């Protein structure tokens, strides 16, 4: 057989002394090999990971619930006897109304409750309820056997009224509102100063204004300022559109207004914003047909809640309208609406600021002369300037460019301000304000 490798490249065992003895690795060598390829903090990271695993294991043991398809605990952790006893002890309660408290100052007071469409009962309190928690006229939960009062219930409020409360704050701040510097200062004096520094009014012995009317042509920033107020304040903010209070059935709109202020009084501090208040706040008149009687009843209830027999509490009211000349004089008087803030057309500085605000979020070239653009848009509202910026972006998209140039803005001014002038209602609304 031919030797292809070659005798000089093949290792042959000539002497047993040439082979070195193989020594087994001890624990020190193994520990040294394990350190190869590790960083400085590998040991600390490993220790933290072990601690996390131990904590997760302990949490799962304490909760006794693991992720499963049914979402139930393992059968070994079920306590059917205790669950059955709980179901027997906690029975569903019936809703009733406490109409009168007998011997309220004594050690054993009695409570007269009225179960709707059933009967009236004189009952006691259960052991879980304190006598100070129950008041006359309050809704309570009673059991079905002895009709004892178990829990006090909150007042009944229409879900449509509850949904008017703004849970998530808008993303509009005062810096996003341009051309309304003076109006924002007046608004903050009414809304923020009484909430943040009430001692200033106490020292002077005056009550802060509780109502503000925002009026002006469409597109001047009335609703935008209200959104900025909602973002700024920590008080509960309720937004109501005037047309929502115009209901089909008699008395429904007035009931919604009552429940709206009833919910607002339960809050520590509350702001109610009525947008397009002229939908229900128009001057009263008799057209002979009686079609507007229900709207007038809703407005009368609103007038009574603003400054009637019952105190309003720490409730601030903002109202916005385009037609202040159509509002009822009783709604406009001081005490109900203490301050009237006019949102007029922005001046040159305001228009320049509005251009910069909208261009801030756009991809535009540098050194655009916003003051020149503002001079080319006389008697324009903030909404029209925003439309100019949008159209400038559309011109850039049409030309397949990634940034908008000054030429795009000039063409947008010619399109929006010049061409759409016949659609503008600003001059007509200026005569109303």
UniProtKB/Swiss-Prot annotation:
Residues 1-22 are annotated as: Disordered. One of its GO terms (biological process) is osteoblast differentiation. GO terms for cellular component: cytoplasm; cytoplasmic ribonucleoprotein granule; cytosol; extracellular region; ficolin-1-rich granule lumen; membrane; nucleoplasm; nucleus. Gene3D superfamilies: 1.10.8.60, Nucleic acid-binding proteins, P-loop containing nucleotide triphosphate hydrolases. Keywords: Acetylation, ATP-binding, Cytoplasm, Nucleotide-binding, Phosphoprotein, Proteasome, Ubl conjugation. One of its GO terms (molecular function) is ATP hydrolysis activity. ATP binds at residues 216-223. It is found in: Cytoplasm. Its main location: cytoplasm. Residues 8-22 have a biased composition (Basic and acidic residues). It holds the Pfam family AAA. Monoubiquitinated by RNF181. The modification N6-acetyllysine is found at residues 116, 422. Induction: Expression is not cell cycle-dependent and occurs throughout the cell cycle. InterPro entries: 26S_Proteasome_ATPase, AAA+_ATPase, AAA_lid_3, ATPase_AAA_core, ATPase_AAA_CS, NA-bd_OB-fold, P-loop_NTPase, PRS7-like_OB. Component of the 26S proteasome, a multiprotein complex involved in the ATP-dependent degradation of ubiquitinated proteins. This complex plays a key role in the maintenance of protein homeostasis by removing misfolded or damaged proteins, which could impair cellular functions, and by removing proteins whose functions are no longer required. Therefore, the proteasome participates in numerous cellular processes, including cell cycle progression, apoptosis, or DNA damage repair. PANTHER family: 26S PROTEASOME REGULATORY SUBUNIT. Component of the 19S proteasome regulatory particle complex. The 26S proteasome consists of a 20S core particle (CP) and two 19S regulatory subunits (RP). The regulatory particle is made of a lid composed of 9 subunits, a base containing 6 ATPases including PSMC2 and few additional components. Interacts with NDC80/HEC; this interaction is detected only during M phase. Interacts and SQSTM1. Interacts with PAAF1. Directly interacts with TRIM5. Belongs to the AAA ATPase family. This is 26S proteasome regulatory subunit 7.
């Amino acid at each position: 057989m031919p030797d292809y490798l070659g005798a000089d490249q093949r290792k042959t065992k000539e002497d047993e002394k040439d082979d070195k003895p193989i020594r087994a690795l001890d624990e020190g060598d193994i520990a040294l090999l394990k350190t190869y390829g590790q960083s400085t903090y590998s040991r600390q990271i490993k220790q933290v990971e072990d601690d996390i695993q131990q904590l997760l294991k302990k949490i799962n043991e304490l909760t006794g619930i693991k992720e499963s398809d049914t979402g139930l605990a393992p059968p070994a952790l079920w306590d059917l006897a205790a669950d059955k006893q709980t179901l027997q002890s906690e029975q569903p309660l019936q809703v009733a109304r406490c109409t009168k408290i007998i011997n309220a100052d004594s050690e054993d007071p009695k409570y007269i409750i009225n179960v709707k469409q059933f009967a009236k009962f004189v009952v006691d309190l259960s052991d879980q309820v304190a006598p100070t928690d129950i008041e006359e006229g309050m809704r309570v939960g009673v059991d079905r056997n002895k009709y004892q009062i178990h829990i006090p219930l909150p007042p009944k409020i229409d879900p449509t009224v509850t949904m008017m409360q703004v849970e998530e704050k808008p993303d509009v701040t005062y810096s996003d509102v341009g051309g309304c510097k003076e109006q924002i200062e007046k608004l903050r004096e009414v809304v923020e100063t009484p909430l943040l520094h009430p001692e200033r009014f106490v020292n002077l012995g005056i009550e802060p204004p509780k109502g503000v009317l925002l009026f002006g042509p469409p597109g001047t920033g009335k609703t935008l300022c209200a959104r900025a107020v909602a973002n700024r304040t920590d008080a509960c903010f309720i937004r109501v559109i005037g047309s929502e209070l115009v209901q089909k059935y008699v008395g429904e709109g007035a009931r919604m207004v009552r429940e709206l202020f009833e919910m607002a009084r339960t809050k520590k501090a509350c702001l109610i914003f009525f947008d397009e208040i002229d939908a229900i706040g128009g001057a009263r008149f008799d057209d002979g047909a009686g079609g507007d009687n229900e709207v007038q009843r809703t407005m009368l209830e609103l007038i009574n809640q603003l400054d009637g027999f019952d105190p309003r509490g720490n409730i601030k009211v903002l109202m916005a309208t385009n037609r202040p000349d159509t509002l009822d004089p009783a709604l406009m008087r001081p005490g109900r609406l203490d301050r009237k803030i006019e949102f007029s057309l922005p001046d040159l500085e305001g228009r320049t600021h509005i251009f910069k605000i909208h261009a801030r979020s756009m991809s535009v070239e540098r050194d655009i002369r916003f003051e020149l653009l503002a001079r080319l848009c006389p008697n324009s509202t903030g909404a029209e300037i925003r439309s100019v910026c949008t159209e400038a972006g559309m011109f850039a998209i049409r030309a397949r460019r990634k940034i908008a140039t000054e030429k795009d803005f000039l063409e947008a001014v010619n399109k929006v301000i010049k061409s759409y002038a016949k659609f503008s209602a600003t001059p007509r609304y200026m005569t109303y304000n």
